[in-house]
């Protein structure tokens, strides 16, 4: 099926067997436990699943923490889109990141090389070493020299959160050598970027964002090879981090409209970035699709478009940023991203508050997640807020 176009895969991925079952959409199975055939085979099934294996035909799924059919459908669909062997879904994006780090620690490779900026929660988790990892923060050009004998992962996010910096995945994978590369692909989604095609071993999504697309379901998912999938499922089973069946249903449903949502929001974001760049209160607009912001030519080679995230830098630092955000009326002041409505936030105060002072976003930087509203209405609201914040200064 993965020979089909992505738009077709988004609609039909993970939908196998529905016609035979006499239904058009997957059922939501909320069972927390499942009957087992007998004592011996039930025990075998439990051990098989608890050690990270996939459910075998005819076996009992035993317990929802070990295996859930709706979650498995969502995983199948995302794996096809990311050109991966398998995918493993979790309760949140941070649960997915935690599982990857725990799997690295369990393999005796607790050292992580990471390129900033990352999502603030990922940065915080790595910086604390809470899971037994150690981290070397490196620039893209420093990855090869930062790798040690016990390095288990190289972690990057592109475009980066919240600066929209672009990372060359071909370069990163070459520098990492035999060390697996984990790419946070939340901002791009598989519509715009497929990191496995560039050699990444693991592709992580906060499925809460664009994959779900409506701000009403939380989840995380990692697309990867079969070896890593087994390791991640074992961590998931032991830690109890399984995605809830209702969340799996909503996220899987979100995939069916992902391409049209992503491209519509991207078109608006590109137009909005150009319009905002002319405002005197803004010192810089960061958006991959703007002229001069992709010097290495990653658009077209790695990404098929600039996405729907924008970062703005305001003259006047924190006070200007605070006033701007608080004067918005249509655009919602909230964390998260990738939903139908446009969201605005001040990363240094919110998502990136725990990040070390030397790596924290500037006080004048604002992150904008562009939604599905008309570009003229968004422009009117943002320009009015910029003008009001200047007048109040």
Swiss-Prot record:
Coiled coil regions in record: none
Modified residues (N6-(pyridoxal phosphate)lysine): 209
Binding site for pyridoxal 5'-phosphate: 63-65, 93-94, 206-208
Binding-site list for L-homocysteine: 119, 367
Catalyzed chemical reaction(s): L-methionine + H2O = methanethiol + 2-oxobutanoate + NH4(+); L-homocysteine + H2O = 2-oxobutanoate + hydrogen sulfide + NH4(+) + H(+)
EC number of the protein: 4.4.1.11, 4.4.1.2
Keywords: Lyase, Pyridoxal phosphate
Cofactor: pyridoxal 5'-phosphate
SUPFAM superfamilies for this protein: PLP-dependent transferases (SSF53383)
Binding site for L-methionine: 367
GO molecular function: cystathionine gamma-lyase activity; pyridoxal phosphate binding
Listed InterPro entries: Cys/Met-Metab_PyrdxlP-dep_enz (IPR000277), PyrdxlP-dep_Trfase (IPR015424), PyrdxlP-dep_Trfase_major (IPR015421), PyrdxlP-dep_Trfase_small (IPR015422)
GO cellular component: cytoplasm
GO BP term, pick one: cysteine biosynthetic process via cystathionine
PANTHER family on file: CYSTATHIONINE GAMMA-LYASE-RELATED (PTHR11808:SF85), TRANS-SULFURATION ENZYME FAMILY MEMBER (PTHR11808)
Family statement drawn from the similarity comment of this UniProt entry: Belongs to the trans-sulfuration enzymes family. L-methionine gamma-lyase subfamily.
Purpose of the protein: Catalyzes the alpha,gamma-elimination of L-methionine to produce methanethiol, 2-oxobutanoate and ammonia. Is also able to catalyze the alpha,gamma-elimination of L-homocysteine.
Oligomeric and partner information: Homotetramer.
Name listed for the protein in its UniProt record: L-methionine gamma-lyase
Organism: Brevibacterium sandarakinum
């Amino acid at each position: 099926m993965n020979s089909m176009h992505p738009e077709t895969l988004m609609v039909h991925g993970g939908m196998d067997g529905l016609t035979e079952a006499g239904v058009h959409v997957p059922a939501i199975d909320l069972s927390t436990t499942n009957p087992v055939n007998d004592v011996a085979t039930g025990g075998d099934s439990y051990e098989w699943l608890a050690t990270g294996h996939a459910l075998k035909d005819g076996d009992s799924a035993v317990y929802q923490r070990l295996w859930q059919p709706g979650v498995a459908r969502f995983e199948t669909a995302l794996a096809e889109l990311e050109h991966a062997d398998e995918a493993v879904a979790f309760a949140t994006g941070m649960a997915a990141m935690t599982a990857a780090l725990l799997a690295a620690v369990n393999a005796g490779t607790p050292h992580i090389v990471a390129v900033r900026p990352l999502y603030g929660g990922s940065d915080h988790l790595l910086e604390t070493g809470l899971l037994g990892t150690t981290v070397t923060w490196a620039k893209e050009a420093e990855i090869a020299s930062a790798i040690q004998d016990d390095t288990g992962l190289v972690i990057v996010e592109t475009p980066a959160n919240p600066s929209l910096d672009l990372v060359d995945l071909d370069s990163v994978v070459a520098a990492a050598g035999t060390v697996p590369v984990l790419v946070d692909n939340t901002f791009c989604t598989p519509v715009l970027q497929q990191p496995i095609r560039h050699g990444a071993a693991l592709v992580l999504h906060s499925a809460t964002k664009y994959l779900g697309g409506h701000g009403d379901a939380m989840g995380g998912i990692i697309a990867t090879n079969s070896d890593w999938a087994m390791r991640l499922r074992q961590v998931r089973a032991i830690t109890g981090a399984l995605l809830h069946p209702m969340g799996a249903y909503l996220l899987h449903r979100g995939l069916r409209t992902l391409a049209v949502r992503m491209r519509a929001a991207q078109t608006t974001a590109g137009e909005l970035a150009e319009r905002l760049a002319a405002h005197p209160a803004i010192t810089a607009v960061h958006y991959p699709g703007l002229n001069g912001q992709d010097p290495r030519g990653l658009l077209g080679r790695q990404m098929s478009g600039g996405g729907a995230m924008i970062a703005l830098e305001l003259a006047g630092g924190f006070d200007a940023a605070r006033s701007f955000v608080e004067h918005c009326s249509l655009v919602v002041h909230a964390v998260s991203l990738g939903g139908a409505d446009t969201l605005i936030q001040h990363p240094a105060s919110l998502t990136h508050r725990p990040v070390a002072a030397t790596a924290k976003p500037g006080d004048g930087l604002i992150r904008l997640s562009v939604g599905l509203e008309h570009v003229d209405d968004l422009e009117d609201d943002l320009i009015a807020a910029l003008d009001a914040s200047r007048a109040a200064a």
